Every structure is written in structure tokens, then in C-alpha cells.
Amino acid sequence: MGHLTLKDAVFLTITSIVGGGIFVLSPLTYLLFGKSIIWGWALLIFVSLIMASPFAYASTKISESGGVYKFVMKILGREIGVFSAYILWLSGVFALSGVVSFFEIVFNTKFNVSYVGLCLIVILTALILGGLRIVGNFVRIFGILTITIILYIVFSNGIKIDSIGEFNLKNAILTIYFGLWTATGWEGITMPLSAFKNQKAIAYGLLVGTFIIGVLYLLFSLTIVSLNVKTNNLDEILKILIGDNLFLLAGMLLIISSCAFSVLFTLSYMPYGMGKDRIFPKAFIKLRKEIPYYGVILNTLLVIILLIFDAKTLVDMSMFSTLIAYFLLYLAVFKESSGKIKAISLISMLITGLLILFRVYNFIIL
């Protein structure tokens, strides 16, 4: 019987989503699109809440751990559901690998240590295999520290409102596209259903956590723009942001670590759920200390292999596959629901479809 609560759902949403992405992608969007990125990060709050709502709805319609692919399977059929399961799982592994890669990037702004990402994923795996109670305690601690550290970064560097650039539609859309990689991850919170006392806690926690994340990202991006740096080098921006403040560096690394921890935990329930649905071997449904340990180990091994790719490649693979999986979920919710959530799922489906087409167009052109 699970013991995670609504508060844990909020913190798990925050720690699953907030990670190294914001520390790399916010400066990256600034390098690509200049001061006008603020409009994209502001719009991302509303886009995220719209796109998260169908996940909250779907989480109330499934009865066991594994994630929203079970809802897709129920509404759109087994074949599409199995495809959705694989692509959600792989996108999660790509995303987790990207987070670990970001840890290496930030860590090595001050140091030059090889295989530090490998060390991180091994340590986190050991913690998670310690059991659900240990996971719950770490999620709460990491959640509070994540919010506190980002606010510290913002207020210690300051915000200058006059640094905001003019609105540019193309730049705003591209900022939203890149920003969504570090703002999405709602599928993760729906995976460990059996770990929660109350199933509705997942839906409420997902939406509250998403709003908090959007505000934190906007504040952080305002700080990046306010620095007004004159460089085209991402590492230089990070060095200016961190300075000689080792406490700040440690805080950023802690946030990235907490994200990797939460994603590795929630993602372990995908092989578990797929084992229940006979997509994966039955061995994956075995639990130890309420943790699907074979799922944890499998995901860890895949991350270690994927670390051969650079962060940008991992981000692109993760974001594109995630958008496809999200499109299928929105289609399923649209088909099954009625009223406001039907309209919201349609809007989400259109946003996701446009982002997919926009990315394909840019890939072909570039």
C-alpha cells in the first residue's frame, strides 16, 4: 500500500521536471533569440497548464501503475497503446540521459572530472533501491530545496524589467518548443500510481506543481536576460551566473540531481506496467521494498549507454518523441471526454501537432 500524499505529488512534479534543463536551455534560448525570449517563457506557463490538464484527467481514469499509456490503450486500442508505451518509455530514458548530461556540463564549469554523470546515476540508483519510504523522504527534501535555490539564484543576481525585448512570434514559438523540454514530464507523475494513498492527489499535485514550475522558470529567465552578457558561449554564461559562488554551484547540482532522482524513480514504473500488460517480461512486475527494481536497473543501464551522445542530441530525441506520445494521449482524452476537458485536449492536440510540424520544418530547412 503506497504512502505518498498530495504534498508529495506536488514535490514529485517539481523535482521530476525542474532539473538541469532550465540552467542550460534558458541561457541557450537567450543565445539563440535574444531578450525576446521572456515572452516565450511567460506564454509557456499557460501552454504548460493547458497541456498538463489532460494528464491530470487521464490519471483519474487508470487503476494501476504504469502511466497514461494505459488510458491510450483503453481508448485507442492495444496496438496504439503499445506504441504509446514504448515511445513514452524511450522519451523518458532520453530525457533522463539529458538531465545526467546537464549535470556533467554544470559540474565541469568549475571542475574537470570524467564520468561524473556515471557516478551520479549509480548513486541515485542505490538510493532508490533502498525503498519507497526513502524515496518519499528525499522527494520532500529535494522539492523544498529546489524552490529555495532557484529563488536564491534569482534574487542574488537580480531582475531588470527594462531588459525585456520586443515580442517576436517566431522567437516566442521556438522558445516554447525548447522550453517545453524542461517544462514537460507530466507522464512521470502518473506512473507510480500504487505509491499514492489517494489517486486524485496525482491530478491535483500535477497542476499545482506545473504552475509553480512555470513561475520559477520565468523568474530565472528574467535573471538571465538581466545579466545582459555579450558572449555566444553557453559555458561563459553559466560561469557568469555562478561566479565564484561554490554554494550556488552546489545548489544547481543538487537541483539537477533531484530531477534525475525523481525521473529514475517514476520511470521505473513503466517497465513494471508494461510487464503487467505483457509488453515486457513478467520479471519486471516484481517489487522489492515497494520499488520495481528491475525497471530501475534497466533504465540505469540504458542511461549509461546513452551518455555517449551530447546534451543537444538527447534533448532533441526526447522532445520529439515526447510530443508524439503526448499527441496520442490528447487524442485519447478528446475521444473519451466531454465538456471543458474535451476542448482543452483539442487545444493541447493542436499545440502539440503544430510544434511537431514546426520542428520538422525547421529540421528540413536547417
Swiss-Prot record:
Q: Where in the cell is it found?
A: Cell membrane
The protein's predominant localisation is membrane
Gene3D superfamilies (alphabetical): Amino acid/polyamine transporter I
- Single annotated GO MF: amino acid:sodium symporter activity
Q: How does it sit in the membrane?
A: Multi-pass membrane protein
- Keywords for the protein's UniProt record, in alphabetical order: Amino-acid transport, Cell membrane, Membrane, Transmembrane, Transmembrane helix, Transport
Listed InterPro entries = AA/rel_permease1, APC_superfamily, Na/Ala_symport
Q: Where are the transmembrane segments?
A: 14-34, 37-57, 87-107, 111-131, 141-161, 173-193, 205-225, 247-267, 291-311, 314-334, 346-366
Gene Ontology terms: cellular component: plasma membrane
Q: Which family does it belong to?
A: Belongs to the amino acid-polyamine-organocation (APC) superfamily.
| Xref: PANTHER family | AMINO ACID TRANSPORTER-RELATED, INNER MEMBRANE TRANSPORT PROTEIN YBAT
Which named protein is this?
Putative amino-acid transporter MJ1196
